[in-house]
UniProtKB/Swiss-Prot annotation:
The protein's name: Holo-[acyl-carrier-protein] synthase
Keywords: Cytoplasm, Fatty acid biosynthesis, Fatty acid metabolism, Lipid biosynthesis, Lipid metabolism, Magnesium, Metal-binding, Transferase
A GO biological process held by the record: fatty acid biosynthetic process
EC numbers, comma separated: 2.7.8.7
Lineage, broadest ranks: Bacteria, Pseudomonadati, Pseudomonadota, Betaproteobacteria, Burkholderiales
Main location: cytoplasm
The reaction(s) this protein catalyses: apo-[ACP] + CoA = holo-[ACP] + adenosine 3',5'-bisphosphate + H(+)
Gene: acpS
Gene Ontology molecular functions: holo-[acyl-carrier-protein] synthase activity; magnesium ion binding
């Protein structure tokens, strides 16, 4: 495996809370995939703060992922096309769907993600890897001066 790209993102949790409040909850529906949305609602029902922290980490993970694959938030990278879920152990992992999944598969890209939050901030880091060999580097240009 070779590193395709890396991405990181830090978000202020209070900003996510403010957007969620301003949009009447629609922000979560716009950003989260269906499995993430279920977890968000369950966590928020138990604790408003934990629900918002979950939303912040998932928003951050999507931003970091979009940077790692070099697209930013442009097609085929869309908010709901990428979900960050958790193994039973708690380890986070990403799942792509639709055209994003096809785009990643065509390039042999997989990704590793980590997320964390602490009171004021949520942070994510993504390493995108590929099993497709990169094209050979161009030969260096020799410059001579007369």
């Amino acid at each position: 495996m070779a590193i395709y790209g890396i991405g990181t993102d830090v978000v202020q949790i209070s900003r996510i809370a403010a957007v969620l409040e301003r949009t009447g909850g629609r922000f979560a529906e716009k950003v989260l995939g269906p499995d993430e949305l279920r977890v968000f609602h369950a966590r928020r029902a138990r604790s408003e703060a934990r629900g918002i922290a979950f939303l912040a980490t998932r928003f951050s993970a999507k931003e970091a992922f979009s940077k790692a694959i070099g697209l930013g938030m442009h097609w085929p990278m869309t908010w709901r096309a990428l979900q960050t879920l958790n193994q039973r152990s708690g380890e986070p992992y990403v799942v792509a769907s639709g055209e994003l999944a096809d785009w990643l598969a065509a390039r042999g890209i997989t990704a590793r993600v980590t997320v964390s939050d602490e009171r004021d901030y949520a942070v994510s880091f993504v390493v995108a890897e590929t099993d497709v060999a990169p094209p050979p580097a161009p030969a260096p240009v020799s410059r001579t001066t007369p």
